[in-house]
Amino acid sequence: MADMKWAVAHIKSSFNNTIITVTDITGAETIAKSSGGMVVKAARDESSPYTAMQMAGQLADQLKDKGINGIHIRVRAPGGNKQRSPGPGAQAAIRAFARAGIRIGRIEDVTPVPHDGTRPKGGRRV
């Protein structure tokens, strides 16, 4: 446990795309990042679980090259007035990190939740 080197994986998953950014433990320095468009070319496939697995596998290889063997995961959905549940790529990415041999510390949901923010879109319902 003393020789573990940790990083933080920020997974932003919507129903249109999945973006994974890996930073150092403070969140200041970006170590590696990937998005759906970097893996597949069709826009309809950017948010798919398969694409998220490919991205996580590539990032796991980059992390191993840099000597990082453990990550904490922060999952984020669009939030605010939008969808509060993460897209299909989030769970697939977490599984792919684990399958690639990266140790997972904490999994945290950091979706922004409004404390009665702006008015939601759509007409008035009576």
UniProtKB/Swiss-Prot annotation:
Domain of life: Archaea
GO terms (BP aspect): translation
Pfam families listed in its UniProt record: Ribosomal_S11
Keywords: Ribonucleoprotein, Ribosomal protein, RNA-binding, rRNA-binding
Signal peptide (residue range): none
One GO cellular component term: cytosolic small ribosomal subunit
GO terms, molecular function: rRNA binding; structural constituent of ribosome
Family: Belongs to the universal ribosomal protein uS11 family.
Its biological purpose: Located on the platform of the 30S subunit.
Oligomer status and interactors: Part of the 30S ribosomal subunit.
Protein name: Small ribosomal subunit protein uS11
Species classification: Archaea, Methanobacteriati, Methanobacteriota, Stenosarchaea group, Methanomicrobia
Recorded name of the encoding gene: rps11
